[in-house]
């Protein structure tokens, strides 16, 4: 937004990265707005003339300055212009607490000044606004402090996700890989800690909540509730500080109604109700020739003109901010804890990625459900939704696709390990007789048994992977393309074995071998029967007729 860009140019007002729109409005826009209003009020208070009093004509300039300073430092009071300044006390025995006796002679009635409502909030207005600005910053500090204690560096993750250099393909790919590695490590740590079932973590679960898989989400909602409670509390303080009477609690609503309708419509103005009065009264004493004289002067509070407008604006702003915060809180509760919404969030992003993906397939939906519950968890899913708000849709889609590819690889490894665990007990001796018979057998026989068991295990694993690939048919394109297999020539190994196992040939044999050299060289290039039957070579070798000699020489 334009307002955020402008405020970012002002020192000490820059935003932190790990915040959403509501947090930015509370801790960034509102707090800076309150600071600006406090500066405006302070400039009027200390740099201008906040109050001007009408003094008697015999006052010198020094007495005028004194009366202005005194009435600014001391609270003033307000009496409506429709009422008399003095009133008669019927019973002379009455004690007047806030009045000054004018006539007092015997049993004659006394007249006293009315002690109107004391007004002193304008003296502390700038400090009150600064206090409110600090309160609006507090929930963000709570989120920043406690979220930094988790393994997920939320601020750094959002900074990388919203980096402007992600428009460069290489930079975007590097950032996605870095985020995948970081998230994979954090999620693996949380899963491993949960499987260990540490006793202190189970007993003192509340004190060890930062080790749980929902810690970041919990702190985020605590900050949301803190934002809501803060704006409600600030609204109450604003009314209590500036509107002392309960009958004036609808003053903000009446003022906005007056602004919209263009007239008071029967509402009281400051002349009647005394809310933000422009004219007040001030009493002070002077000594003249040893005698104490009481003076009552009438003062003009120009500062209340600004204070009234600030109150009306803040009253409406807090109402809108409360409604917006409540709506945002319930929307996040729905987004995090609604399973259907979470599944559609992942399915829609997987459907938008480059890999063909059918979100209506039941198998795909099952994998997405397992991906959310077993792999991401509450914090992982919440962080992806937070990234979706900060980063662009292309970056978010590719990041979710990369994490889903990692999940598919982990599922394939888990299926392979289950198959191996099912086959390995078949290769172990069941009783002591088999152990003794295994010891008495020849080494070649035991080697053949192990080799056959290994071949059977590899066949079972390959068949299991084949069945898994057919089940995960839409996700095959996540895998890297098959690299061309290298052709290995086993002639050198056969020659070395033949040299080691045989003696030096006779001269006649050398001649015979030299005559048959082309045939022998061609035969030496072909793998032996043992190598052909070995499972380690059957995957790489092809018939020799398909391999040209030039390619062999170039390879070697």
From Swiss-Prot:
InterPro entries of this UniProt entry?
Answer: Innexin
Gene Ontology molecular functions: gap junction channel activity; gap junction hemi-channel activity
Tell where it localizes: Cell membrane; Cell junction, Gap junction
Q: Which residues cross the membrane?
A: 21-41, 127-147, 213-233, 310-330
**Would you identify the family this protein belongs to, as annotated?**
Belongs to the pannexin family.
Domain of life, per lineage: Eukaryota
* Low complexity composition-biased segments: 514-527
General function of this protein: Structural component of the gap junctions.
Q: Which PANTHER family match?
A: INNEXIN, INNEXIN-7
Compositional bias annotation for Polar residues: 435-447, 463-474
Q: Name one GO cellular component term.
A: plasma membrane
Q: Name one Pfam family in it.
A: Innexin
The record gives the membrane topology as: Multi-pass membrane protein
Task: Please list the residue ranges that the record marks as compositionally biased, kind Basic and acidic residues.
Answer: 452-461, 539-556
GO biological process entries: monoatomic ion transmembrane transport
- Keyword Membrane appears in the UniProt entry: yes
Q: Where is this region: Disordered?
A: 431-556
Report the glycosylation sites.
267
Protein name stated in the entry: Innexin-7
**Listed Basic residues bias regions:** 500-513
Is Transmembrane there in the keyword field? yes
Q: Which UniProt keywords apply?
A: Cell junction, Cell membrane, Gap junction, Glycoprotein, Ion channel, Ion transport, Membrane, Transmembrane, Transmembrane helix, Transport
């Amino acid at each position: 937004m334009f307002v955020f860009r402008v405020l970012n140019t002002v020192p000490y007002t820059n935003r932190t990265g790990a915040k959403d729109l509501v947090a930015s409005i509370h801790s960034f826009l509102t707090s800076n707005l309150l600071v600006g209003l406090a500066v405006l009020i302070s400039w009027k208070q200390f740099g201008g003339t906040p109050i001007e009093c009408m003094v008697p004509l015999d006052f010198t300039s020094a007495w005028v300055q004194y009366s202005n300073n005194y009435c600014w430092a001391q609270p003033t009071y307000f009496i409506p212009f429709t009422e008399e300044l003095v009133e008669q006390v019927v019973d002379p025995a009455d004690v007047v607490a806030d009045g000054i006796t004018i006539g007092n002679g015997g049993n004659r009635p006394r007249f006293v000044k009315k002690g109107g409502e004391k007004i002193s909030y304008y003296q502390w207005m700038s400090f009150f606004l600064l206090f409110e600005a600090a309160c609006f910053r507090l929930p963000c500090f709570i989120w920043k402090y406690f979220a930094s204690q988790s393994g997920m560096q939320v601020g750094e993750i959002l900074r990388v996700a919203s980096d402007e250099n992600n428009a460069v393909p290489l930079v975007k790919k590097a950032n996605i890989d870095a985020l995948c590695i970081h998230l994979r490590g954090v999620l693996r740590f949380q899963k491993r800690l949960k499987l260990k079932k540490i006793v202190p973590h189970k007993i003192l679960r509340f004190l060890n909540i930062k080790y749980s898989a929902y810690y970041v989400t919990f702190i985020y909602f605590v900050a949301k509730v803190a934002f809501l409670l803060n704006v409600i509390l600030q609204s109450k303080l604003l009314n209590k500080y500036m509107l002392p009477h309960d009958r004036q609690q609808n003053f903000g609503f009446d003022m906005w109604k007056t602004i919209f309708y263009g007239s008071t419509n029967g509402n009281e103005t400051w002349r009647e109700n005394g809310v933000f009065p422009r004219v007040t009264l001030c009493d002070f004493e002077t000594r003249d020739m040893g005698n104490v004289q009481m003076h009552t002067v009438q003062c003009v509070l120009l500062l209340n003109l600004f204070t009234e407008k600030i109150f009306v604006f803040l009253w409406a702003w807090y109402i809108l901010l409360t409604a917006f915060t409540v709506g945002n809180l319930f929307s996040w509760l729905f987004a995090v804890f609604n399973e259907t919404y979470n599944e559609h969030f992942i399915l829609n992003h997987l459907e938008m990625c480059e890999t063909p993906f059918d979100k209506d397939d039941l198998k795909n939906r099952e994998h997405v459900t397992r991906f959310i519950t077993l792999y991401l968890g509450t914090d992982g899913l919440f962080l992806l939704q937070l990234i979706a708000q900060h980063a662009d849709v292309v970056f978010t889609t590719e990041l979710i696709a990369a994490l889903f590819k990692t999940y598919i690889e982990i599922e394939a490894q888990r299926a392979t390990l289950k198959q191996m665990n099912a086959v390995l007990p078949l290769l172990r001796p069941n009783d002591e007789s088999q152990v003794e018979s295994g010891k008495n057998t020849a080494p070649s026989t035991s080697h053949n048994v192990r080799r056959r068991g290994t071949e059977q295990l590899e066949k079972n694993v390959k068949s299991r992977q084949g069945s898994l690939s057919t089940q995960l048919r839409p996700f095959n394109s996540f895998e890297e393309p098959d690299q061309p297999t290298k052709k290995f020539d086993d002639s050198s190994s056969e020659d070395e074995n033949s040299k080691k196992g045989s003696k030096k040939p006779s001269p006649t044999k050398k001649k015979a071998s030299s005559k048959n050299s082309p045939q022998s060289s061609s035969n030496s290039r072909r793998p032996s029967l043992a190598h052909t039957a070995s499972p380690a070579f059957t995957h790489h070798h092809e018939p020799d007729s398909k391999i040209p000699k030039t390619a062999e020489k170039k390879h070697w």
